[in-house]
């Protein structure tokens, strides 16, 4: 596939004179392009929904959700994975982000890493990939060899797979069970796929991880009831979540949370059902952690 023929690499006729514009006009132009991203994603929501269901099923069976990409795409996967433990209370290692070239590539490009088709496979082998894991390959261009090799290996093992790219009918899409291809058009700055393409990938990842965690019972109403209260901000958030879910006072919420070691779900259950902390935990275990079912 010729890079120059890709939509993501083509010149944008709306921004041909970007360097001649005033600062405000330049930013307005970029913003006009950014506004196209959500509309492009709306068109591929059925594919995103498929990927969410696959991810949730994999995680329910004890598998992992593994993101893999190079450059901006890889960094976005690492970012989303790193946010899952504090947001949803899942263990580190349940959602994993891999970037071509390893952790050092987060800060500085590792030359040639993305072009190594065997490297993606080796990185997954190092994780001892099994068929219960789901692998999501990310590449704005849709042609990154590192991602192709990884998806091919995952598919051979029988893993559920998804590919996220911003060009239609891309090579990585052909390697995956589910293809998510929001076509956001040429970038405001030609070929700079950290812009619209990066934004599109981030929005899809937001939905993928959040949707899967909702299905795992990590959310009640629209509240992150498995949040880990590991700092002052998150302790405050835990209190506010309990208040929102139960209607009690701040003082009552804090009292309940102290009895549950600041675990939100049992605190809510205690207050709404009038049970002890131990009984609340037992009810949650019986319902596999699903707060709504326990209520």
Swiss-Prot record:
GO terms for biological process: 1,6-anhydro-N-acetyl-beta-muramic acid catabolic process; amino sugar catabolic process; N-acetylmuramic acid catabolic process; peptidoglycan turnover. Its EC number is 4.2.1.126. It catalyses: N-acetyl-D-muramate 6-phosphate + H2O = N-acetyl-D-glucosamine 6-phosphate + (R)-lactate. Induction: Induced by MurNAc 6-phosphate that releases the repressor MurR from the DNA. Repressed by MurR in the absence of MurNAc 6-phosphate. The keyword Membrane does not apply. One of its GO terms (molecular function) is ether hydrolase activity. Pathway: Amino-sugar metabolism; 1,6-anhydro-N-acetylmuramate degradation; Amino-sugar metabolism; N-acetylmuramate degradation; Cell wall biogenesis; peptidoglycan recycling. The active site is at residues 83, 114. It holds the Pfam family GKRP-like_C. Keywords: Carbohydrate metabolism, Lyase. Belongs to the GCKR-like family. MurNAc-6-P etherase subfamily. Homodimer. A lyase-type mechanism (elimination/hydration) is suggested for the cleavage of the lactyl ether bond of MurNAc 6-phosphate, with the formation of an alpha,beta-unsaturated aldehyde intermediate with (E)-stereochemistry, followed by the syn addition of water to give product. Specifically catalyzes the cleavage of the D-lactyl ether substituent of MurNAc 6-phosphate, producing GlcNAc 6-phosphate and D-lactate. Together with AnmK, is also required for the utilization of anhydro-N-acetylmuramic acid (anhMurNAc) either imported from the medium or derived from its own cell wall murein, and thus plays a role in cell wall recycling. This is N-acetylmuramic acid 6-phosphate etherase. The gene is murQ.
